Regions:
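Secretory-pathway ectodomains
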Residues: 18-488
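Sec-dependent N-terminal signal peptides
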Residues: 4-14
Length: 488
């Protein structure tokens, strides 16, 4: 197969229209700088700093909320309780979710043993800059203190339901017959009051079913059902998927995993009323084990949510990829095995798949080439393109985002050898012409470490962490770099 070199090379110094500095000399200690989303669209960013702990063990955090253009929306302080006065006990940020003008901050107390307890929340209205409510997730815990330290075995996961509030998924593994598996799934409003609660009617022989939240938005909730038996939390397997209505909690789709092969699903997404799942598949054995280097092809399974039925199931052996030298176990000649990083559905119903090849050496991988696969509406191969990129010890793909005016999609990945020799690569795929154009940006900076993150449409975020923070005066610089793309 003919190898394709990079079609467009951009070598430039950074020039940014919008930026935000995280000041080293500012009060408190830097905790995080995170993007937050409205469904799948970037809405803004929030910086969090830990300020101080008073004599009553109240830990004060300062927040600064920015919009997607890095303009300040609001700022203020929130407080969280520390369980004891031990220096080893820390209050840490666990997650941030945004829904309908509200930011919900989740915190844990972490102890010297590494255990997490006392998951608590604070909800902020970013329009009025007021704290709406605060509380502890587990209602059995009346206060964050030593007295209740060992009372909770539940794990709580929070997700945004957009305009419909927040989803709380409480899961507890088996401890004894008196304390069995437990799973509570419910939606809450701005006052943290329950809107609806979901109770599953599905059983799996003599096992317990616990659900993992995979994706949520204004319309749907996608959950993965795991079957457990006994008190061994490693002895479980994925048995089915369900889709719920975000507004009511009603089950819309029940999808069982095919027993024909062993599946490793790399992606799950809902688009246009269809659930898409896919990844590698393996020959079935009695113990449901598999060799990660012995897959036999790619699978894509599609379910129709409205009709609650299977729409399509495609099994694609590797030998069907005619324009790449690949054996029946997914090994590309001279380049190694394939790992599939991203599968996107194009507006015309076709698919764009991004993959990287790698060699497995002991416990580490060396990543070699980059591949793109064009697939038709039934997930059959149309065209494969191979790109020459640097070998790296880690994978290169980072994230993707839409190009302006829905003209295509940009895929971002690093070729990294060391901090002084970075390459930011941006692969633009255009829907109308089906053209692929790669930009290569060399990044050389002796004074800082660089990473990238999602930004508003048409831009990429650059985070620059300064090595000599005292000299620079800043801890880090967050900036937006405008993308070069074609207008079709």
């Amino acid at each position: 197969m003919k190898k394709i070199i990079f079609l467009f090379i951009l070598i430039t110094q950074f020039s940014f229209g919008q930026s935000y500095s995280v000041l080293k000399q500012a009060d408190g200690d830097f905790v995080s700088f995170d993007p937050f989303y409205e469904n799948t669209d970037l809405f803004g960013y929030v910086e969090l700093r830990e300020m101080n702990t008073d004599e009553n063990l109240n830990v004060t955090f300062k927040y600064i909320v920015l919009d997607k253009n890095m303009n300040k929306i609001c700022s203020g302080e929130i407080k969280q309780k520390k369980a004891d006065d031990a220096k080893s006990t820390k209050v840490i940020l666990d997650d941030i979710n945004y829904a309908n003008g509200l930011l919900r901050f989740d915190f844990y107390n972490v102890f010297i043993s590494g255990s997490r307890n006392f998951k608590a929340y604070t909800t902020l209205n970013i329009t009025t800059n007021t704290i709406v409510n605060t509380g502890i997730y587990n209602p059995e815990i009346k206060a964050i203190s030593k007295e209740y330290k060992n009372n909770s075995r539940s794990l709580f996961n929070t997700s945004s339901l957009g305009k419909n509030g927040f989803l709380i998924n409480e899961r507890r593994l088996f401890a004894s017959n008196k304390d069995p598996f437990y799973n509570k799934i419910h939606a809450v409003d701005t006052k943290n009051e329950t809107i609806w609660e979901f109770t599953s009617s599905h059983v799996f022989k003599d096992k317990y079913i616990l659900y993992k939240t995979l994706a949520t938005d204004d319309n749907y909730i996608l959950m993965e059902g795991h079957a457990y038996k006994g008190n061994n939390d490693n002895n479980h397997k994925i048995v089915h998927y369900i889709v719920l209505d975000s507004k009511t909690g009603k089950e819309l789709l029940f999808a069982e995993v095919s027993e024909k092969y062993t599946h490793i699903f790399d992606y799950h997404f809902i688009q246009n009323g269809l659930l898409y799942m896919g990844g590698k598949y393996y020959e079935k054995n009695k113990n449901n084990n598999y060799n990660s280097l012995a897959s036999i092809g790619l699978n894509q399974t599609v379910f129709d949510i409205k009709s609650n039925s299977l729409s399509r199931e495609t099994y694609l052996p590797y030998e069907k990829f005619k324009d790449v030298e690949i054996n029946k176990s997914g090994k590309v000649s001279k380049e190694g095995y394939l790992t599939f990083q991203k599968t996107s559905l194009n507006p015309d119903g076709t698919f764009f798949v991004l993959a990287e090849s790698y060699w497995q050496k002991s416990n580490c991988r060396t990543y070699t080439q980059l591949y793109t696969f064009m697939m038709d509406k039934d997930f059959n191969p149309i065209k494969t393109v191979e790109y020459n990129v640097k070998q790296t010890k880690g994978y290169k793909y980072d994230f993707s985002q839409r190009l302006p005016d829905t003209t295509g999609r940009a895929y971002f990945f690093f070729d990294k050898t060391d901090d002084r020799d970075l390459e930011l690569n941006i692969l633009n795929y255009y829907y109308k012409s089906k053209k692929q154009v790669v930009q290569k940006m060399n990044i050389s900076n002796d004074n800082s470490t660089i990473s990238i993150f999602p930004a508003k449409t048409g831009y990429v975020g650059i985070a620059e962490y300064y090595k000599d923070q005292k000299k620079q005066g800043n801890y880090m610089e967050i900036r937006l770099e405008k993308l070069n793309y074609e207008r079709e």
